[in-house]
């Protein structure tokens, strides 16, 4: 993959992504199956045409119907027996050339419209180029290097795109496409999520260039859709009303606001016009009920009179509204004042829910979709058999053959590291299947807590004083056993109410108790208090806080208290464990800094809230301690805009902590999709270099830039049943794959560094986009597994992505709480998307700024 210049041609040198340095050999070999299916492709040229449809900006579904109608209509004169495939946007491929002039051809097409009228379209088709699948074979076998393999260009001459379009054409016509997945309405099953939403099951399908061959990645998929039902019923679900007949009065303001939030933007169809089911998009819910909501009605004599919606429906349709006391939907454009009573509207089928699911809905979704690895393996195999690619006329047209057996892959299970604890015995723990026990062990470096406070935001009735006393006694016992002694009783223990009392209470504590190390905050469930505690503690006053849910105070368990101690120790500067020094990889022989970076974006459809970029850096030689830096930036921007200054801050902090300058920088970048690789690498690699040079003119540490991807659909299964681990039958922690299903020539690998508890384990995909340090495959895979996955402070388990990338995600997520505007926070609890609308960039930047006393700690743990 070549990385071109962002400026004028030749202004910057090309950046070349490193080729694979060889294959890993370390670890115990294991036989695996991957949900990748080989696609045999002929060595032929296919023909690419650019399609332009007017009117434009139609959904892909409509574009597909237009092109399908056009192909049928011009079958005799143009298309003959050819079966073209189309990507729904601009690219159409044929196996044989079309008889059209080089200048192109303009054609007419129609689709049936509402009310019996046809919708006319103009379609222009123009030849672009031949696309060579022979060249693709050359690339896959390593005989030639291609242009970047991208799937996102509007008109792509990339042969991979052509393969993808062929295999997606028929499913796109049969099912509801969402991204790279296909869904169909539930038949024979029902998985309601509540709130008018339900689970739809489907399958993911994408083509991947792999070693020597093309692979088709197939996986089961699920997402939330809105239930097709009467709007009245939808409103009842949203507002938790069991029977609308029990709602004789108009909706309250809070009910109206809640229902507006849920239904705005959805399509509804009317039921009062017989078979003519006209569709509208909802823009609002009226304040007034149908019996009082008026609009200007023009009579036949030209006179305009005011009519209520209820009157109009009675006069025009002889329809006496059953619920005139309920509001109306305002549909179409707001300025046009088109109102529909709720009772004549249905939610249109097939609308995906892009809004954030509630906690309960997320929990229901996980339960409905979690499958053990063997079950998922069987379901994927069934999906491939039922797809019946050998009978797909478009697959046949282009002479493809899709094998229906999963790819056989040889993986390796990397050895787990030995972890050093502290205390007199300096005990060593060896993880088994990604898990180890801390019982009988003490933190490597435990903190002594001499002054601490408790703020209880649960009511005294919920959490009585004797319960608090029991909790603190047990916490002190567990913490002492863990080598983090908490001395005496808390210097302050008071009840409080509401988010407004957080800041004055914390200020009082800071001013009254010099040397206060920790405030333990007890929360009464999901509440805005949490966001305010973190805002005040992290950004305003620089105080360490640890929140605990009241249910865990009332019913304590050694496990919960032990997990609390893991967090508290590192927040106060302690170290939980380290890799046994003699086992550390050779990269640690010189100063090395591990950086993790992530950008979190606001929920879909919310363009006003900012994206948040976070970078963390290791601050010791273990690496165990980390510092963080965070910035707000333009919504939905993936490149970290201020990366140079963020990395500079962390390099300075590393030097202050260790008195060394790193000779190597290992940069784990989360959240980047393949289509963004070139752009993000080009900008961010230069930013890291700029940070180094800004500190010292000749300072050029070796940089290794690795993208960590979790949002993919590759799954690995044990070929040998006896090697399955746990109740879910997953692959062992440490399983790595860098052959067969990986990139034909670039440096990438899959690593499952954690033990799957529920459902099927998802291995992380690592793609090395830059490597000054010339790591071997073994070195980088071991570095990613041993120190990076086993030093995450929240638990005594190895985690699914490297600790620095995980911490960056936590920092960005915490910053969302810092941006919550407490005055406008909803009663639903700390809604992490924030309430930052309308605040200027300077105010947002200031709100996200961490207090100087907190900055050097792992406050985000």
Swiss-Prot record:
It is found in: Cytoplasm, P-body. GO terms for cellular component: cytoplasm; cytoplasmic ribonucleoprotein granule; nucleus; P-body; RISC complex. Pfam families: ArgoL1, ArgoL2, ArgoMid, ArgoN, PAZ, Piwi. Disulfide bonds: none annotated. Residues 530-567, 758-806 are annotated as: Interaction with guide RNA. Residues 518-820 form the Piwi domain. Gene3D superfamilies: 3.40.50.2300, paz domain (2.170.260.10), Ribonuclease H-like superfamily/Ribonuclease H (3.30.420.10). Its EC number is 3.1.26.n2. Keywords: Acetylation, Cytoplasm, Endonuclease, Hydrolase, Metal-binding, Nuclease, Phosphoprotein, Ribonucleoprotein, RNA-binding, RNA-mediated gene silencing, Translation regulation, Ubl conjugation. The modification Phosphoserine is found at residue 826. GO terms for molecular function: endoribonuclease activity, cleaving miRNA-paired mRNA; metal ion binding; miRNA binding; RNA endonuclease activity; single-stranded RNA binding. A divalent metal cation binds at residues 598, 638, 670, 809. Coiled coil: none annotated. It catalyses: Endonucleolytic cleavage to 5'-phosphomonoester. The modification N-acetylmethionine is found at residue 1. InterPro entries: AGO3 (IPR028603), ArgoL1 (IPR014811), ArgoL2 (IPR032472), Argonaute_Mid_dom (IPR032473), Argonaute_N (IPR032474), PAZ_dom (IPR003100), PAZ_dom_sf (IPR036085), Piwi (IPR003165). Residues 230-349 form the PAZ domain. Signal peptide: none annotated. Residues 824-847 are annotated as: Disordered. GO terms for biological process: miRNA-mediated gene silencing by inhibition of translation; mRNA catabolic process; pre-miRNA processing; regulation of stem cell proliferation; regulatory ncRNA-mediated post-transcriptional gene silencing. Ubiquitinated on surface-exposed lysines by a SCF-like E3 ubiquitin-protein ligase complex containing ZSWIM8 during target-directed microRNA degradation (TDMD), a process that mediates degradation of microRNAs (miRNAs). Ubiquitination by the SCF-like E3 ubiquitin-protein ligase complex containing ZSWIM8 leads to its subsequent degradation, thereby exposing miRNAs for degradation. ZSWIM8 recognizes and binds AGO3 when it is engaged with a TDMD target. Required for RNA-mediated gene silencing (RNAi). Binds to short RNAs such as microRNAs (miRNAs) and represses the translation of mRNAs which are complementary to them. Proposed to be involved in stabilization of small RNA derivates (siRNA) derived from processed RNA polymerase III-transcribed Alu repeats containing a DR2 retinoic acid response element (RARE) in stem cells and in the subsequent siRNA-dependent degradation of a subset of RNA polymerase II-transcribed coding mRNAs by recruiting a mRNA decapping complex involving EDC4. Belongs to the argonaute family. Ago subfamily. Interacts with EIF4B, IMP8, PRMT5 and TNRC6B. Interacts with APOBEC3F, APOBEC3G and APOBEC3H. Interacts with EDC4. This is Protein argonaute-3. It comes from Bos taurus.
């Amino acid at each position: 993959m070549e990385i071109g210049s962002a400026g004028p041609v030749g202004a910057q040198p090309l950046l070349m992504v490193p080729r694979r340095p060889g294959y890993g050999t370390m670890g115990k070999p294991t036989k695996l199956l991957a949900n990748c299916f080989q696609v045999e492709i002929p060595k032929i040229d296919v023909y690419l045409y650019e399609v332009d449809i007017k009117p434009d900006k139609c959904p892909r579904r409509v574009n597909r119907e237009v092109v399908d109608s056009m192909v049928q209509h011009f079958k005799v004169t143009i298309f003959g027996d050819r079966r073209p495939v189309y990507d729904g946007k601009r690219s159409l491929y044929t196996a044989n050339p079309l008889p059209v002039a080089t200048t192109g051809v303009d054609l007419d097409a129609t689709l049936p419209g509402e009310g019996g009228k046809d919708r006319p379209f103009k379609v222009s088709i123009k030849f672009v180029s031949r696309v060579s699948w022979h060249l693709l074979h050359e690339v896959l076998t390593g005989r030639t290097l291609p242009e970047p393999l991208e799937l996102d260009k509007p008109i792509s001459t990339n042969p991979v795109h052509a393969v993808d379009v062929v295999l997606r054409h028929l499913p796109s016509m049969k099912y509801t496409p969402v991204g790279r997945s296909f869904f169909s309405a539930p038949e024979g099953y029902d998985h309601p999520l509540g709130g008018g939403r339900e689970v739809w099951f489907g399958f993911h399908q994408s083509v991947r260039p792999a070693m020597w061959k093309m692979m088709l990645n197939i996986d089961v998929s699920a997402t939330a859709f809105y239930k097709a039902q009467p709007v009245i019923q939808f409103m009842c679900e949203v507002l938790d009303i069991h029977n609308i007949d029990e709602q004789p009065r108009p909706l309250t303001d809070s009910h109206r606001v809640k229902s507006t939030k849920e239904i705005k933007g959805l399509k509804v169809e009317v039921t009062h016009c017989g078979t003519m089911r006209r569709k509208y998009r909802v823009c609002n819910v009226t304040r007034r009920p149908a019996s009082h909501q008026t609009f200007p009605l023009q009579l036949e004599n030209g006179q305009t009179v005011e009519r209520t919606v209820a009157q109009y429906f009675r006069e025009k349709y002889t329809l006496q509204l059953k619920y005139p006391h309920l509001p109306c939907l305002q549909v179409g454009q707001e300025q046009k004042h088109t109102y529909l009573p709720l009772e004549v509207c249905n939610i249109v089928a097939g609308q995906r829910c892009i809004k954030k699911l509630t906690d309960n809905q997320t929990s229901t979704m996980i339960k409905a979709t979690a499958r053990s690895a063997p079950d998922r393996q069987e379901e994927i195999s069934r999906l491939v058999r039922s797809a019946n690619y050998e009978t797909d006329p478009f697959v046949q047209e282009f002479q493809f053959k899709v094998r229906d057996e999963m790819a056989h892959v040889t993986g390796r299970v990397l050895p787990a590291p030995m972890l050093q604890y502290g205390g007199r015995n300096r005990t060593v723990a060896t993880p088994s299947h990604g898990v180890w026990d801390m019982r009988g062990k003490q933190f490597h470096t435990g903190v002594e807590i001499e002054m601490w406070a408790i703020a209880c935001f649960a009511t005294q009735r919920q959490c009585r004083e004797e319960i608090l006393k029991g909790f603190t006694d047990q916490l002190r016992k567990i913490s002492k056993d863990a080598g983090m002694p908490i001395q005496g009783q808390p210097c302050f223990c008071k009840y409080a109410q509401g988010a407004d009392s957080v800041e004055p209470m914390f200020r009082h504590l800071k001013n009254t108790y010099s040397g206060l190390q920790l405030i333990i905050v007890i929360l009464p469930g999901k509440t805005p208090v949490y966001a305010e505690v973190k805002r005040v503690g992290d950004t305003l006053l620089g105080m360490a806080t640890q929140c605990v849910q009241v249910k865990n105070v009332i019913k304590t368990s050694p496990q919960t208290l032990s997990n609390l101690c893991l967090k508290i120790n590192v927040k106060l500067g302690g170290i939980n464990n380290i890799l046994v020094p003699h086992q550390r990889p050779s990269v640690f022989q010189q100063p090395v800094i591990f950086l993790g970076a992530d950008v979190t974006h606001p929920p879909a459809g919310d363009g006003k809230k900012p994206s948040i970029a976070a970078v963390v850096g290791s601050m010791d030689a273990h690496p165990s301690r980390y510092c963080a830096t965070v910035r707000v930036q333009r919504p939905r921007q993936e490149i970290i805009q201020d990366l140079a200054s963020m990395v500079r801050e962390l390099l300075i902090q590393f030097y202050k902590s260790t008195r060394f300058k790193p000779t190597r920088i290992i940069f784990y970048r989360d959240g980047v999709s393949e289509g963004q690789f070139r752009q993000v690498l080009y900008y961010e690699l230069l930013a890291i270099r700029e940070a180094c040079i800004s500190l010292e003119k000749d300072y050029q540490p070796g940089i290794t830039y690795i993208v960590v991807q979790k949002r993919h659909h590759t799954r690995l299964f044990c070929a040998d049943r006896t090697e399955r681990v746990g109740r879910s039958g997953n692959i062992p922690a440490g399983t790595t794959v860098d052959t067969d299903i990986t990139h034909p020539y670039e440096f990438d690998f899959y690593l499952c560094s954690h033990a799957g508890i529920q459902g099927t384990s998802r291995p992380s995909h690592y793609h090395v986009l830059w490597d000054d340090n010339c790591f071997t495959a073994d070195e980088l895979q071991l570095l990613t597994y041993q120190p990076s996955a086993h030093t995450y402070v929240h638990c005594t388990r190895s985690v699914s992505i490297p600790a620095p990338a995980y911490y960056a995600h936590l920092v960005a997520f915490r910053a969302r709480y810092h941006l919550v505007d407490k005055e406008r926070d909803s009663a639903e609890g700390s809604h992490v998307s924030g309430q930052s609308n309308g605040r200027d960039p300077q105010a947002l930047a200031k709100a996200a700024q961490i207090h100087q006393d907190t900055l050097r700690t792992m406050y985000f743990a």
